[in-house]
Amino acid sequence: MYKRQEVCEHFVGRRLALDPVSQSQVLAPMHRGESGVANLNRILQSRLNRRTTSIKLGGSEFKVGDKVIQNRNNYDLGVFNGDIGIIESVNLEDGSLNVDFERRSVQYQKTDLFDLALAYAVSIHKSQGSEYPVVIIPLLKAHFMMLQRNLIYTAVTRGRKKAIIVGDPAAFAMAVRSSESKTRRTLLKERLSEA
């Protein structure tokens, strides 16, 4: 288990011999907080992408070379929730940009940008169904509400070659010890018997 400040060092490739954008993925338990998705994306963007030309929209800033994720199905563009790509070009005149989704270029108009987010870090929940060569998982006690064994299992199994857990060893221990899964009360049995 590594110290939490090492998450960026691992991700930017100082310790891993791989491309930090295309060959690894940071998976965070939560969106908010010091090691949440939002903060990690800001930090990682500043370290990995020093370009200055950008489109700013709301609280987001998009630059050529940024790793981004589609957050909603868009059938008109042919991109779907969870698709990850790299920004190829930015047009400052009309606020559009092009994203490469595995060798398929998609043009986003300014109104479509609300469905994009930085993807240097994504939530563990969002990563379900995806795989990456290497995953880096920051764990802190601040995530106590989310620290469940099944969450750690989900995160670790996203990595094909390696999973690196960064953070507080006590937080990891909390998660591993926590085997209580919340019982769902849906009334499904009763509804099926009525049908």
Q: Each PLM stretch: what is its role?
A:
Residues 3-77, 88:
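Conserved helicase motor core of P-loop NTPases
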Residues 80:
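Conserved flavin/dinucleotide-binding core of flavoenzymes
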Residues 83-195:
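C-terminal accessory regions
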